[in-house]
Amino acid sequence: MSTLHVISHSPFGDNRLDSCLRLLGANDGLLLCGDAVYALQPGSTACERLTASNLGPRLFALEEDLLARAIADSPARAVDYPAFVALSLDYDKVNSWL
């Protein structure tokens, strides 16, 4: 069973991202939105952890949030809202890390 994990909180304020990365299954995806896209800042510890997690094509970020935070060079695939909806249907479950 696959799960799309959605994180919207900054990786610098709590440990949601680290907890999520520990629990990710082989078929799970991760979507970063809101302040969570700060995890994609090149050179940050959070970005290094994401890169080391080998998510590859299963790492997504809301394009609108990347643009709003001026994050241009990201290992995540940028998606718009319709693609976010499509992603949520591609996975068996969606888990929002509130």
Predicted regions and their residues:
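Structural motif
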Residues: I7-S10, G34, E63-E64, L98
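Short internal beta-strands
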Residues: D28-D35, P57-E63
